[in-house]
Amino acid sequence: MKRSSQDSGSRSIPEDRKLYVVDSINDLNKLNLCPAGSQQLFPLEEKLQDISTDSGNGSRSLFLVGLIIVLIISLALVSFVIFLIVQTENKMEDVSRRLAAEGKDIDDLKKINSIIVKRLNQLDSEQS
């Protein structure tokens, strides 16, 4: 009696494994990962290898796209900085021209002031 219980226990484990394998194959067939009618796992392994190599190429292409985007953005920023430098230079030239013109005006005003002061001094000396 003891033997029959041990035998039935040892036989139930392989049967459970067989059921598990059959259920797994059925699940694969439902997911269309395994070709219809075949129960070999080699095509699945080939598909997994194809997926892994495609993901490597995808990451490379994603990296290249990201690199190109970063280069375009940096080129745009450099162009913008150059544009700002040119605009600042133009503004500085305008300011320096205005200062030079105002400096000439100030010199003219000083000359006129000195002429007026001389004339006033002459008038004061004539009156005294």
UniProtKB/Swiss-Prot annotation:
Where do the TM regions start and end?
65-85
GO CC terms in record = membrane
Q: Which Pfam families match?
A: DUF4577 (PF15145)
Alphabetically sorted, this entry's keywords are:
Coiled coil, Membrane, Phosphoprotein, Transmembrane, Transmembrane helix
In this UniProt entry, the residues modified to Phosphoserine are S24
Q: What stretch or stretches form a coiled coil here? A: 87-111
Q: Which domain of life is it from?
A: Eukaryota
Q: What is its main location?
A: membrane
Asked if the Swiss-Prot or TrEMBL record annotates the protein with the keyword Coiled coil, the reply is yes
Keyword Phosphoprotein, does the record have it? yes
- What membrane topology is annotated for this entry? Single-pass membrane protein
Where it sits in the cell: the answer is: Membrane
Q: What is this protein called?
A: Leucine-rich single-pass membrane protein 1
Give the organism the record lists.
Bos taurus (Bovine)
Q: Which gene encodes it?
A: LSMEM1
